[in-house]
Design a protein with these regions (language model features):
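A glycine/threonine-rich phosphate-anchoring loop and its flanking beta-alpha core
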Residues: 74-172
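N-terminal small/polar loop signature for handling phosphorylated ligands or for N-terminal nucleophile
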Residues: 5-80, 191-202
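Catalytic cores of large soluble enzymes that bind and process phosphate-bearing ligands
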Residues: 5, 31-34, 61, 146, ...
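Glycine-rich His-Gly loop
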Residues: 1, 59, 100
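Alpha-helix N-cap/helix-start motif at coil-to-helix transitions, marked by capping-box chemistry
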Residues: 7, 11, 131, 149-156, ...
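Active-site segments that bind and position negatively charged phosphate/pyrophosphate groups
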Residues: 164-206
Length: 206
């Protein structure tokens, strides 16, 4: 999205790709709560540039838009066709999700939320194939997050941890993960909000 571009984070990634002489195309029009139109536009660029893989840079919105492109690249049709549970039949292209926030956990989840602009509803897409092939959480990329966004995404992470802990589907393993997440958020979130350059706090929030 444009925030990533304006913050100079995109250039960090493109410099690496340029040094490796890798060709790429950039879609930077994703909005918070990405829409079916975002997905369609991004997929048109994917086809036009003859792309063979997907890299998303950002938070949950960027990753969800990338997942939407993955559905269309691997299976065709429209994103609306995949609303529901496990509607895809074929695998995605290779997909790398690079995080710049610490909250949504979309980079490791099989959920994709896309706004249907005609019905004015959020479509819930649950499909194991949309889990990224590789997820990268680098605290250095999160140091530019402003305090308000750091706090908001941190509370999002806390909400996910509490939800997992009180879920009727919880297991001893998920409880252990949720407890550790709450412990780390309690220890590091306030530090990350107070000083965005605190690498230990940023890493703890990853």
């Amino acid at each position: 999205d444009q925030g990533i571009v304006n913050a100079g984070i995109l250039k960090v990634i493109t410099d690496i790709l340029d040094a490796a002489k890798m060709k790429y195309a950039i879609y930077d029009k994703t909005i918070p709560n990405p829409t079916d139109k975002n997905v369609a536009e991004a997929f048109e660029l994917y086809k036009k540039e003859k792309c063979d893989s997907i890299v998303t840079l950002g938070g949950g919105s960027s990753h969800d838009c990338g997942k939407g492109v993955g559905f269309l690249a691997g299976n065709g049709g429209k994103i609306h066709d995949y609303e529901g549970v496990d509607k895809s039949k074929k695998p995605f292209p290779p997909y790398v999700a690079v995080n710049t926030t610490a909250g949504a956990a979309s980079e490791m989840a099989r959920f994709c939320i896309i706004t249907d602009t005609s019905r004015k509803v959020k479509m819930a897409i649950v499909d194991w194939r949309c889990t990224p092939s590789v997820a990268i959480d680098d605290p250095v990329l999160m140091m530019g997050m402003p305090p308000a966004l750091t706090a908001a995404t941190g509370m999002d992470a806390l909400t996910h941890a509490v939800e997992a802990y009180v879920s009727t589907a919880a297991t001893p393993m998920t409880d252990a993960c949720a407890e550790k997440a709450m412990e780390y958020i309690n220890r590091y979130l306030r530090r990350a909000v107070a000083n965005g350059r605190d690498k230990e706090a940023r890493e703890g929030m990853c």
